[in-house]
Amino acid sequence: KVTEVYVGIAGHHIRSKQHRGNIIIHEEEHIITKEDLERLKNEQYAILMEHGEQIIDVIPQHYIVDNDSPTLNPVGRIGKCLAGDFHLITGNRTNIQNIYKSVQLAGYEVKKLVLEPIASAESVVNDEEKLAGVCLVDIGGGTTDVAIFHEGIIRHTSVIPLAGNVITDDIKSCCSIIRTQAEALKQNFGACLETPTSANEIISIP
């Protein structure tokens, strides 16, 4: 029986920022471990945010040991100061709590909130593309979600409050038609590719 679920999150309230954190290791000749990386990551959830904001996810970018060159994997190196650059994804605390409450009312528990463009990338972007560098743009109804990968790591995310519904509303206003007709025009005659179109082309309103 399924009791826990991953839940996608998006919306105008989503923000992202870069942040550097560090931990000091007092043990002499300490060898960096995976536990150290996990401790450093978990400490980022405790940083002060703006009022009403909550951290949704903390994504490591790279690590620095004792002010040395950045590395993706410092495990096994000796050092006393472990720093890391992180991509923080934040959202409105009330909106997040409402999601948790809705899932609980449905009889489940939220295992993890996942930003929707990151979830989409898991379905359509392969590891080679993430290594080479790729930008995923997911145009939905209410928002356009963006995720940029490079060297296999997510480097930037954003949620833009302009999407398909805005296009439908623009067609509705410009053509003075009802919304269902505008949506049908968009779906039947709209194109995302830059192709030559005839200025004299006549279309019929569904």
Task: Describe the residue ranges of each PLM region.
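Nucleotide/phosphate-binding catalytic cleft detector across ATP-hydrolyzing
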Residues: 1-136, 153-155, 175-206
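Glycine-rich phosphate-binding loop of actin/hexokinase-like ATP-binding domains
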Residues: 132-174
